Each structure stands twice: as structure tokens, then as C-alpha cells.
Amino acid sequence: MLRNGVDIIEIDRLEKINPGIRARFINRVYTESEIEICGNNYPCLAGRFAAKEAVSKVLGTGIGEIRWKDIEILRGEEGQPIIKLHANAKLKEIELGIHHWAISISHSRTVAIAFVIAH
């Protein structure tokens, strides 16, 4: 069965996070590898945030049953985004019989969007 998920986020939502809690937020949502990829590049972080939301929609759970770090958005050999799942997200992937993922992330100056397809 083909499944899809999409999410869009305003980039300034991340930029405007209170500096006093920004590091804690980033460390709660993103893995070390994702932080290494994006650094303080807010369009990159926003794209991965949208991607995690889109993946959670494909899995039919939303964020909650699945933790943010259970969904990891890495870089493939050619720089393309790839999805790597852990813990509850991986269990849900197996339960749903998902074997293939496709993801697209894009952003403008103001928003980031991610579209995910799985089967």
C-alpha cells in the first residue's frame, strides 16, 4: 500500500525560539548527525523538522507515540535526504510492511516543506 505524508513549517518558528531554551530544543528534536549536517542553518533544521512530521504522518502516529529522534533525516552519498528509523518508528515501519521510502525537502526564504512517500 502506498502511503504519503507532507508537512510545512515557517523557518522563523525555529529562529524565534527563546535563546535560553534553543539548545535544549535542538538536542531534543535532532540527532547528533542531523546537528552536524545542519549546524545553525535554520532552513536545513526546518526542512528536517518538516520531514520528521511527514514521516510520522506516513506511519500514522504523529509525534508523541514516536520520539523526534526515532526519525533521523541523513544525507545520502549524493547529498539527497534519506530516512533512518529507530526504536518505535522502526517497529511501526515493520508493522506496516514498509520497505521503501522516498523523501523530498525544499525551502524558500520563509518556509520549509517535506513530502514523503513509502510502500
Question: What annotation goes with each model-predicted range?
Answer:
Residues M1-H119:
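Core catalytic alpha/beta fold that binds nucleotide/phospho-ligands
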